[in-house]
Structures are given as C-alpha cells and as structure tokens.
C-alpha cells in the first residue's frame, strides 16, 4: 500500500478494490450494495460482501453483523411522485450498541477518510440498530 493511503490522524487507508467496487455500484449498477470492514492487519478498509442488483433491502440488512461495526453503501431505487425512476446512493455507518467499544472507536475515527473516497454518495446514515436504517428511513431521506 502506498504511503499516501495511510494517514494516522485520519484513520485507516482505503483498498483500491474498495474504491473500484463502489464505482461498479455507482456507474455500472453491478451491485445493489457493498459492505466494507476494517482489516486491522492491513490497516485499510476492504470489501467484505457485495449484493447483486436483484437482492432486496432485507437481504442487505441481514448481511450486516449483529454485534460488529461496518460501513456500507446501498443503491436505493424508487419512483418519484411524478412517476420518474430514480436512484440514490446511501452511505451507512453501522455501529450497533452491542459492538465492542474498540470497534466503535476505530470505525468512528476512520469514517470521514473513507467517506471522502466515495464520490457520488447522496445521503449518509449513522445507525446503531436496524430501525435507524430501515427502508422507510431511506424512502423519507430520498424524497
């Protein structure tokens, strides 16, 4: 990894694969969602799981760990009141109450650095339990 990719004051570096996978979601619509985790050995944010374009929001939510932090992007498709098909990309910082304090701190201190790498995100959600990021929350934010 390049020296430029790591900056102690702003959290973990970001793996090129993570950036490229986000671009696949944004430009090519290859993924419905991408879940990222921090690899402490590599000191960077890496892709943990992707969901295909046909996967549902429930499948995405179920893929997030119950007791550990993650970052995720979700490509939310919806129809406006004018009957136009739209898509908005959500960045979700998942930090469940039951996760370890160390993990919460690590993800909190690395979030801004990682988030800046994801050009094209429309909305950001910080969630500590599933109700803070359910489909209704996304709908309200997107409209």
Curated annotation (Swiss-Prot):
<keyword id="KW-0009">Actin-binding</keyword>
<comment type="function">
    <text>Actin-depolymerizing protein. Severs actin filaments (F-actin) and binds to actin monomers.</text>
</comment>
<dbReference type="GO" id="GO:0030042">
    <property type="term" value="P:actin filament depolymerization"/>
</dbReference>
<dbReference type="InterPro" id="IPR002108">
    <property type="entry name" value="ADF-H"/>
</dbReference>
<dbReference type="InterPro" id="IPR029006">
    <property type="entry name" value="ADF-H/Gelsolin-like_dom_sf"/>
</dbReference>
<dbReference type="Pfam" id="PF00241">
    <property type="entry name" value="Cofilin_ADF"/>
</dbReference>
<feature type="domain" description="ADF-H">
    <location>
        <begin position="11"/>
        <end position="143"/>
    </location>
</feature>
<protein>
    <recommendedName>
        <fullName>Actin-depolymerizing factor</fullName>
    </recommendedName>
</protein>
<dbReference type="GO" id="GO:0015629">
    <property type="term" value="C:actin cytoskeleton"/>
</dbReference>
<dbReference type="GO" id="GO:0003779">
    <property type="term" value="F:actin binding"/>
</dbReference>
<comment type="similarity">
    <text>Belongs to the actin-binding proteins ADF family.</text>
</comment>
<dbReference type="InterPro" id="IPR017904">
    <property type="entry name" value="ADF/Cofilin"/>
</dbReference>
């Amino acid at each position: 990894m390049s020296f430029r990719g790591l900056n102690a004051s702003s959290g973990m570096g970001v793996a090129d694969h993570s950036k490229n996978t986000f671009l696949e979601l944004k430009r090519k619509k290859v993924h419905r969602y991408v879940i990222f985790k921090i690899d402490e050995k590599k000191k960077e944010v890496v892709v943990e799981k992707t969901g295909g374009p046909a996967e549902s929001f429930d499948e995405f939510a179920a893929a997030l760990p119950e007791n550990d932090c993650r970052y995720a992007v979700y490509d939310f498709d919806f129809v406006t009141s004018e009957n136009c098909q739209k898509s908005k990309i959500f960045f979700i910082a998942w930090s469940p109450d039951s996760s370890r304090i160390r993990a919460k701190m690590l993800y909190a201190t690395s979030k801004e650095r990682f988030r800046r790498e994801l050009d094209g995100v429309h909305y950001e959600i910080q969630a500590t339990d599933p109700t803070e990021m359910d489909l209704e929350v996304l709908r309200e934010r997107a409209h």
